[in-house]
A protein has these predicted regions:
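Cell-envelope/extracellular polymer assembly enzymes that use nucleotide-activated donors
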Residues: 3-5, 36
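Short beta-strand/loop segment that forms part of the nucleotide-sugar
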Residues: 33-44, 65-66
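Short, well-formed alpha-helical segments that are part of the catalytic scaffolds
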Residues: 13-28, 47
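Conserved donor nucleotide-binding strand/loop of the catalytic core
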Residues: 52-86, 91
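A conserved acidic beta->alpha catalytic loop
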Residues: 41-51, 99
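Short beta-strand-to-loop acidic/aromatic patch adjacent to the donor-nucleotide binding site
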Residues: 88-100
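Residue-level signature of catalytic and energy-coupling elements of molecular machines
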Residues: 24, 79, 98
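Acidic donor-diphosphate engagement hotspot in glycosyltransferases and nucleotidyltransferases
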Residues: 48-49, 76, 104-106
Length: 106
């Protein structure tokens, strides 16, 4: 089975990210896939809420916290570097955390 990593940069919009994760999870309901999500937190000033949504179709969700706000492109670069150095994967998909990239297009 092919391993896919979804990279999502985030700054302060945790509600949108949780909604996106739930939508991705539903989208994967009929798939047989090995999909993990890596969220890059760009030094958000808002506290991350405790979300207990069930994401049973995702293998894992990992959050990497940046020490200082560096912007969207730096978050993507940091996430890609992490994936290439630490993860076993076949595909990488970068998605915006605000829902601009539709999970239906996965």
């Amino acid at each position: 089975m092919k391993k896919t990593k979804i990279l999502i940069p985030i700054y302060n919009d945790w509600q949108s990210v949780f909604k996106l994760l739930e939508t991705i999870n539903v989208q994967l309901d009929s798939w047989e896939a090995d999909i993990s999500v890596i969220i890059i937190n760009d030094a958000s000033t808002e506290e991350r809420p405790n979300n207990t949504c069930l994401l049973n179709n995702l293998k894992s969700v990992h959050v990497i916290n940046m020490r200082e706000n560096r912007g969207h492109a730096r978050c993507n670069a940091t996430g890609l570097k992490y994936i290439f150095e630490k993860e076993d994967f076949d595909y990488v998909i970068i998605m915006d955390g605000d829902g601009e990239d539709r999970p239906a297009e996965l």
